[in-house]
Structures are given as structure tokens and as C-alpha cells.
Amino acid sequence: MLTGEGPIDFIHVAGASSSRAAAGSHNYGRIRLRHFVLCGLRWEASMPWYDTQGKLQALVPGQTSTVFPLSPSGLVFPGDAGVPKTLAPTRYNNFAPRIGLAYSPGFSDGALGKIFGGPGKTSIRAAFGIYYTSVEDLTLFYEVADAPFGLYWTSPVSVMMDEPFRIRATGASIGQRFPFTAPVPGAASNATLDFSVYEPFNFFPGYGTHNKLPYGEHFNLSIQRELSKSTVLTLAYVGTAGHQLITQQEANPGSAALCMNLNAANAYDTTSDTFGCGPGQENDVFNTVAAAPCGVAFNSNCVYGTRQSLNSPNFCQGATPQVCFGSGNTYTFTNANSIYNAGQITVERKANDFTFLAAYTFAKGLDNSSAFNDLVNFLNPKLSRGLSSSDIRHNFVASYIWAIPFDRAFKGAPKRLTQGWQVQGITRFATGFPIQMNQSDDDISLAGSGGTDMPDRVGPVKTVDPRKSNPGCFNPNTGGDTGCYFLPGAFAPNTVLGTFGTANRRFFHGPGFNNTDFGMLKRTVIHENYAFDLRIEFFNIFNHAQFKNPTGNIDDSNFGIVTSARDPRIGQISAKFYW
């Protein structure tokens, strides 16, 4: 229930809702006694999130708003041409077919009879399906309370602590922006709303106006064979292809070509009082003809930053410096994709005293974005393609429970002492997660965009035991040659201006898993309605050192160095009384 009071509704999470429509049909069919088919079709319509008061905005290069005519080109709002209240249209053509097949071989003689075990001993299954997902509400959270409906302003220069709108060096005012009154969508005064108070726009997200609904294609094939009355073996292939996945990319990157041209011309940087253009100068104003300020009005001899994608010439008269769109402006796009393929082997046994499940997976996952904030390369999304951040190539897990039959071994002993003993555990051996490579501090690409600059790969990657001495390893924390997981000599900082580096951002794995959790339980039945449990548990019982991934940031002094580990052995004792 809405109270009408914003803070109260926010605390109670009132007023947040979503709309989603779907319809489906399934048909079951048995072709023969041992053949079974399931077909289905689902229709999905999921509306993107929107603000009920229309207080949203989007970024569309070169488009001028009619809702707020004085806003800079590139900034648009619901009601502008091609911009619905949901920013992206609700699409109604999302049809998701699916089919499943099952077959139980009936061979009883010959080689096939031995392979399949006879009638009713083996089941072969295959399936394919398309599944849509709704758009996560985090995408709307990124859009709300941005200009002109909220004010997030970053000073381009150092300011005084007590008066943060005054330049520390000169004492000159760059404009007091607070407090301010947010406009009301549809008000007549919006036609003359002054946007200079919001400029420059930094860390300003924009939801793609052509976004679609993410979906996945799922497919699998499995053979399940009964080995005995209590044991089943399963061999399976599992695959998933993700399409139109939500991700982010830089909306207004710096132009490397423009920066290098300014550098070749030895243009005067009016912001830093230097000559030439290089890393970190995407938001600076350059005078191409004289070593002089560009003035308050637009000057055709000046270049207003190298970020020209959203708005060219990217000039805003009220901004300081006079750049409309600065750093951290991103698109939320549905242009990511993924592929996952896995082979699986599972053995399961369920007996009176002993139960276990053992599974091994050999898999590979690739994508160009593993998460919402895993930025895609704005120039070419294929440059971001690599191992998924969750990729684990080899993964073996076994779980087991053994009810120890002391009562059968010591038949003359009291039942309360010999019954109720149980040991259980989970053992895992697995390769680690991929190491994320980057070169975060140098801005060699001249793009001013996080997550896209990479080091150069200059040799094969060699992984080593961080507990041992390794030539080629230098640990700045100890001054020794231990602690490396991979030797840094395989990489070098990229120094070629205007390029992204040659290393893939995720292409090899970090330290793996070697872990066993073990527990022992003794249940004592005191009376028909009373029982007492005593449980002893150990996590990582063998106390294996399981290192976490080192940093893959070549600008970090700990590049390739293991600095943390997962939990050591932890033991606990607990008791529980039942009545």
C-alpha cells in the first residue's frame, strides 16, 4: 500500500511492481511402449522496468530532446521520439519452443543387451528448449535519481572543504548547485529548464532504447544405466547458449585518433596548462591555435574533450570545464552472449548402510560479459570474449553417508551405545576460477573506459606453487621469490597508445580446490519420544591451503601474487535434544 510519503514508501519497499505475461502449451505423446515425446511452446512478454512518474532518462547519440529542449544533445527522456516510458519497447514476439524425448532400449540379447542391461535397465533422454528471463530491476536502479530528477555532480578541480563549490587554488566560485528542485515531468516549465546546474554529466547511465529480452537455449543428452538394484550410472552432455544478455559498456569513450591528432599538433590543454594530448585527458579542453583559454562562449578553435560519441562538439557553456559528458557514462545493453558445454558423469548408490553420490564435470564456458557490471569493449564486443568468470574446467564432487553397523558387530552390547552412529562427508577436487587480466591505471587506449585496457601477452603463462621458491618471482611483500601463482614475465604493460593490449581478459585459471568436509553423528534414542544428537564436524578437515585468485592487474604491485586463501580447518561440536 502506498502512503504517498516517499521516504516511508521507500523504507517499506512500497510502490515497486513489475508486469509479466506468459502463456504455454504442452503436448505429451507415447509413440511406442518405450518411446516418449514432450513438446511445448511458451509465449513470454516481460515489460522493462519504468518509473511511474516518468523520471527516467536515456542516452541516444545525437538526438535532441523535445521533452527538455535545453538539455544537451544525446540526453533523451520518456516521451521523446523512440523513447517509451520503459525506455526500451516491450516486445511481444518472444516464443519459446521446447521438446523432450525419452527412450528405453528393450534389447535383451547380444552385445546391445549387455551394454543396455536388458529391458527397463537403461533410459536415454534428450531435450532442447528456449527460455526467456525478465530484465533485472537493477537496471532501473541505475537510471533513477539522475539529472534532471536528481543531482550527482563531480567537481573537475580541487575545491575547498568548507565551500565545495569554490576552487581551492583561486577561491573562484564554480557555482553552488545545492539545494535544487527536481522538475515534474510534463510541466510547462520544462521547456526552459536550465541544465547548466547538472553539467558536466559524470557516471550517468543510460538504458539502451533498443534492448531486447535475454534468453537462453538449453540442450542436453543423457544415458542412465542401472548397474545394480541400488546403483545408477549417468552419462550426460549439457549445453547452454545465452543471447541478448544484460551488460554495460562505455557510452562516450575518448577517441584515440582525435587525441593523437591533438598531440601531433601540440595543442594547448587549457585544463591542465600543458601541451599535447595523452592518457587521462579525455575530459580536457584543448585550444588548437593558441596557448590561451577558450573563453566562455563556444570557440571553433577549441576541442571540448575527446569524448565525442554522444554529443559533438560536446560543448556545454555552463560546465567547468566546458564539457557536457565526462567520465563514467555507460550504456546498459543486451548485447552480451555466452556458451557453455559440459560432459558429466554421475554414479549414485543408495543402500541400507551406505549412500554416496559422485559426480565429475568437464566443462567450458565462454562469454563476452559474465555479469551486469562486467563491461564489454565498446569498440568491438568480440575483444571481450573469453572464459566465463564462473568457468571451472574440471570439477569432481563426492558426498557420502555411512551408517556404521556397530550393532551388528557388537551384538551383545547395549543398543543405545551401538546404534545411531553415522559418518558423512563431502569431498571436492576442482580447478580454479579464471584470473581477470587488466591494466587499470595507464589509460593507454586513450578511451578513459574501465575494464577494457589489457596488458600485452609476451610469452606462455607458467603457473607455479606459491609455497615454493620460483626464479622469476618477486614478492614485494616479503622481498623473496615465493608467493607467485603465475610468473609475471609472461606479460608486459601495453605501451602502444590507442590500443587495448594483446592479452585476453580471462584465459587461464587460478588455484584450484582440494577440500573435504567431514562429520560424525551419534544419535541416542532415550525413549520413544526423546532422542539426543551429538555431532562433530570439520570443514577442510585435512587443512589444505586453498589459495584465492591473485590479481591480474599488471599495474598492481601484487600482480600474480597470492595474498589470500579460503578458510583453514574449522571444527565444531553441537548437541541437540529432541522431545
Regions found by a protein language model. Name each.
Residues 1-2, 100:
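Accessible peptide chain termini
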Residues 119-160, 243-249, 424-431:
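Surface-exposed extracellular loop regions of Gram-negative outer-membrane beta-barrel proteins
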